[in-house]
Amino acid sequence: MSKMTPQEMAAKIGSGLLSFPVTPFKADYSFDETTYRSNMDWLCGYDVAGLFAAGGTGEFFSLTAAEVPEVVKVAVDETKGRVPVLAGTGYGTAIAREIAMSAEKAGADGLLLLPPYLMHAEQEGLAAHVEAVCKSVKIGVIVYNRDNAILQPDTLARLCERCPNLVGYKDGIGDIELMTRVYTKMGDRLTYIGGLPTAETFALPYLDMGVTTYSSAVFNFVPEFATNFYAAVRKRDHATIHAGLKDFILPLIAIRNRKKGYAVSIIKAGMKVIGRDSGPVRLPLTDLTEAEMAELTALVKALPVAASAQQAAE
């Protein structure tokens, strides 16, 4: 069980960069615990405020309900309290509660509540869903506002009154007006996380709206670049930010946008580039082609900080 209160967890993750480690798989697509332990230990050596086990980049959608707590338990064991470990949960309410409780038992410090599977629901239904998950555990919960689970400010305010352990709001929409209304309504009651794909692109404007942190997928394979970029965002160092976007982030996005599902696939490909091969993505996702791998390799190796990541893997 976590030793952190929901409020302590929220304060910690709001103080620095966050990331979602990939879930390594073997050739037969089974969980590769050895590689996962190695990756988690390595990532903990960098300045990161929280790691999300079995999150979106960790292919939560392809894990079974039994695999999620298994992955979380390994993450908690390997990080050894160096950083908070948060777990993904989602799907329908019954399954989300089941995964939430098993993740709490496995030692997770908090939860990221992903949108329910496929269905669109009214605000009252979404609110009841979030409340049911929050009340099934004692650890802190972060709601992920995106796709078919968009909570409006008034709904969020009511949930915060009913659920003291609802401590975070992750935005995956990019609706500036909605984000402004949420922050204006809730203020410092919540910790706000930027959660758009390749969040570095939106980090600076979001900082001015009270979003002090974001989840960096590229932290998985270029952690030094990711932490340097985050530091530049906090300092509002426009020159460094724009150089990072131009030289790395935007070219990476160009490769990612070629095929559906590449938001996850390209991160696992990046792990392979630096010598930390974490196996294939699970179906229905597909891996990068050889030509795309060559492009990504050239892009990563052009980074001055890429050499240190590769040396650490050797």
UniProtKB/Swiss-Prot annotation:
Alphabetical list of SMART domains matching this protein: DHDPS (SM01130)
EC numbers listed for it are: 4.2.1.41
Q: Which SUPFAM superfamilies match?
A: Aldolase
Q: Spell out the reaction equation it catalyses.
A: 5-dehydro-4-deoxy-D-glucarate + H(+) = 2,5-dioxopentanoate + CO2 + H2O
Q: Which domain of life is it from?
A: Bacteria
Q: Which GO terms describe its biological process?
A: D-glucarate catabolic process
Name the keywords, alphabetized. Lyase
Q: In which pathway does it act?
A: Carbohydrate acid metabolism; D-glucarate degradation; 2,5-dioxopentanoate from D-glucarate: step 2/2
Any one Gene Ontology molecular-function term assigned to this protein's record:
5-dehydro-4-deoxyglucarate dehydratase activity
Keyword match Ion transport: no
For this protein, the record's PANTHER family field holds:
5-DEHYDRO-4-DEOXYGLUCARATE DEHYDRATASE 2-RELATED (PTHR12128:SF19), DIHYDRODIPICOLINATE SYNTHASE (PTHR12128)
Record family assignment: Belongs to the DapA family.
Name of the protein in question: Probable 5-dehydro-4-deoxyglucarate dehydratase
Could you tell me which species this protein originates from?
Bradyrhizobium sp. (strain ORS 278)
Taxonomic lineage of the native organism: Bacteria, Pseudomonadati, Pseudomonadota, Alphaproteobacteria, Hyphomicrobiales
